[in-house]
Design a protein with these regions (language model features):
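Low-complexity, highly charged intrinsically disordered N-terminal segments
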Residues: 53-55
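Active-site palm subdomain of RNA-directed nucleic acid polymerases
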Residues: 77, 81-114
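Amphipathic alpha-helical interaction segments
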Residues: 96, 100-103, 120-124, 145, ...
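Acidic/Ser/Thr/Pro-rich low-complexity tail/linker regions in eukaryotic proteins
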Residues: 1-36, 41-48, 60-76, 91, ...
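A short alpha/beta connector and helix-capping loop motif
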Residues: 122-152
Length: 687
């Protein structure tokens, strides 16, 4: 007899009770039985919640023996009726059912709430009501039982993953930002952190562990935020939540996460697999710490920050990135009438574009400024079509660092205020929200730009940066600035005037030439490798490809060499002389590493450059400003300062409507603190 739900009374939930698992003597299959009771949540019933994934739980790529999940439903008996569940939920119930009656109270699952069973998934009205109650359901639970999926033969007992977490948890916070880390295979990495060595195999097991789907689920954010206690199951193993959070903090606060990315990317390249780097970029276990630390935050959480951090997690439905954080922002059971109206305004639609627009308006109104615009990614990375240009796509990966800062800095230490003196007016919370009214001043038109970060890296097009500098030095449009001033504008712009977290000063100026050395060394290295490979080529097709690439890079080499010679003659403290570059490259090639002081400079200055230039490009304006902004910028785009925005922005006029498209936030040297915020403000609309 198929299962039928009875209607739920308002304020009630269903709980699974009398869970039992028995094995069939003839087939060995597990038979699951349970009952489903209705209880009033307001009476404070004792129960646990299950946190799991509806989809395949494992990251199969690094498993020696992959687990094949079937897209079929499995029968259980509920209230004497047939009920169907997924394979992963069946596995979870089998393990949980077998653990009942254990010696520890935390292992006794007498009553448990599971969304797929306790909510009538075919009743849309009930689903909306129960989803709105979920944060309270998890907050009231005695424990949240996490099912990560089955134990796998590659890592019996999760021993390797557990050892890595145990070792990472021993890193002292004082070493998080101070330890210099080189490579996961180098002993000095672990010595500098004060921990034991971790082998490559252990890192791979740990990588497969953290890429289990549960860690990247968007709804996990809400479930873990409100949980009182955790029981973490990985197969029959119960793992300590404290070690998981400690490891997540270590990955987030050190560069270990980046080194893990590099190691996995190298491994993929070796076995000719599609790169996993994009998966590791968001390091799901490290991201758990973002929301875990919110619990101890004293000041109220802003919707802006929660929406920004939602990018680090996966969601089957794009709108869930907003819906899953609303109760963290303003718990439903604790909302004032006005806050309930605001939440209802956001949830009025389930269409992702509309949900994102509404949430953006609310976030801007809450912060009372326009720094929310710094969360808007370059349009190359946008996944949702139809979004207004000023609305962030929260489903896009967080591949750049917002200039205005995220999380926000305290006003007392915030460095930039490009719109100083301009008055910001909050937009209304209405249904006519496709257009965003703003006020500001147009500053100048873009006339020239360099290549993107990826082309600087992959195609060695650093010469385009030098070309912009050369034309900038030759331009007569901005009298009154010396050659020294223009070189300073150039190098400070490329690192957004920031070095080691501070305003760029003499140390940054000294280190800057290593950017030129680094990029030229990469070009030199590829050319040398191609020429050597040509001596041992295996087929004619390969020969043709290599010859063409060598010709292309040789031309780039010559262009770059000429520009370096020309520019270093004007200021070799910023653009080093050719012989200085060659000497540095020779030391690097001969010793496998730069001398210690040079190595420290290249690591620090490249970190500053990458943070500033990632997903951006250098530009020059008609009146002689240098800046960096979104890589999709184009000639004739206009630099503006907008009331309420801490940094300048680049806008593009839409000729058909007279409105403006938001291109991206910008660092523009010389106008970061109100220098250009003078004159009659214009009122415009962003669309």
């Amino acid at each position: 007899m198929p299962f039928e739900y009875s209607p739920l009374t308002a304020g009630y939930i269903r709980l699974i009770t009398n869970l039992s698992v028995s094995s069939s003597p003839s087939t060995g299959d597990d038979k699951i039985k349970c009952t489903l009771d209705e209880v009033d949540l307001g009476t404070g019933p004792n129960y646990n919640c299950l946190s799991y994934t509806w989809e395949e739980p494992l990251y199969q790529k690094y498993l020696l023996i992959p687990r094949i999940y079937k897209d079929v439903q499995y029968p259980i008996e509920c209230n004497g009726q047939a009920f169907s569940i997924t394979e992963n939920l069946r596995d979870a119930l089998v393990e949980i059912g077998k653990s009942r009656g254990g010696g520890e109270d935390l292992q006794r699952q007498d009553k448990i709430w599971i969304d797929a069973v306790c909510i009538d998934q075919k009743n849309e009205e009930e689903k909306i009501i129960q989803i709105n109650m979920m944060s309270q359901i998890y907050a009231n639970a005695q424990n949240v039982v996490v099912w990560l999926g089955p134990e796998m033969p590659d890592d019996p007992g999760c021993e390797s993953a557990l050892r890595v977490m145990e070792v990472l948890s021993q890193i002292l916070p004082a070493r998080f930002k101070t330890a210099v880390l080189s490579h996961l295979g180098n002993a000095d990495t672990y010595q500098n952190l004060g921990i034991d060595f971790i082998s490559k195999r252990e890192w791979v097991c740990f990588g497969a562990f953290i890429l289990r789907r549960w860690f990247s689920r968007m709804w996990v954010v809400q479930e873990t935020f409100f949980a009182k206690n955790f029981i973490i199951y990985c197969g029959s193993n119960i793992l300590p939540w404290s070690q998981i959070t400690a490891a997540s903090r270590a990955l987030k606060e050190t560069s270990l996460g980046s080194l893990l990315n590099e190691m996995m990317e190298d491994r993929d390249r070796t076995i000719r697999e599609q790169s996993t780097a994009s998966q590791y970029t968001s390091n799901p276990i490290a991201n758990q710490f973002r929301f875990h630390e919110y619990k101890n935050q004293v000041s109220p959480l802003k919707l802006e920050r929660l929406l920004a951090d939602s990018r680090y997690f996966g969601a089957k439905e794009a709108q869930d990135r907003v819906f899953a954080v609303l109760n963290i922002w303003k718990p439903k059971w604790d909302r004032a009438d006005a806050e309930e109206e605001t939440a209802s305004f956001i949830m009025k639609s389930s269409i992702p574009v509309e949900v994102y627009e509404r949430a953006s308006i609310v976030a801007i109104r809450e912060t009372k400024d326009l720094n929310f615009l710094s969360l808007v990614e370059d349009k190359k990375w946008r996944r949702l079509s139809g979004l207004p240009s000023w609305v962030p796509d929260f489903s896009a990966p967080p591949v750049w660092t917002p200039l205005a800062g995220h999380p926000r800095l305290a006003k007392s230490i915030n460095r930039w205020d490009a719109a100083a003196g301009l008055t910001f007016e909050r937009p209304a919370e209405t249904n006519s929200y496709h257009l965003l009214p703003v006020k500001g001043l147009p500053i100048d038109e873009i006339v020239d730009s360099a290549e993107t970060d990826l082309n600087l890296i992959d195609e060695h097009m650093i010469y385009t940066l030098l070309e912009v500098l050369s034309r900038y030095l030759e331009s007569a449009n901005f009298p009154g600035t010396s050659t020294t001033d223009r070189f300073e504008a150039f190098w400070k712009t490329l690192i957004k005037d920031t070095f080691l977290g501070e305003p760029a000063g003499p140390k940054a100026r000294k280190a800057f030439p290593m950017i030129i050395v680094h990029f030229f060394r990469e070009l030199d290295y590829e050319l040398d490798g191609l020429r050597k490979a040509l001596e041992n080529v295996l087929n004619e097709d390969e020969t043709g490809t290599q010859v063409k690439r060598i010709s292309q890079l040789s031309e780039i080499y010559s262009q770059t060499q000429v520009l370096i010679g020309k520019l270093s003659a004007s200021d070799d403290s910023i653009i080093p002389k050719w012989e200085v570059i060659q000497k540095a490259i020779k030391m690097r090639n001969d010793n496998g590493v730069y001398p210690e002081d040079m190595h420290e400079d290249v690591v620090n200055i490249m970190e500053s450059f990458d943070s500033a230039y990632s997903c951006r490009r250098l530009f020059r304006t008609k009146r002689g400003f240098l800046g960096i902004s979104a890589q999709s910028l184009d000639a004739k785009d206009v630099v503006w300062v907008l009331a309420g925005a801490a940094v300048p922005v680049v806008l593009r006029e839409i000729s058909s409507t007279g409105n403006w498209e938001f291109v991206g936030e910008a660092y523009v040297h010389g106008i970061m603190n109100g220098e250009a915020a003078v004159g009659q403000e214009l009122s415009i609309f962003l669309e």
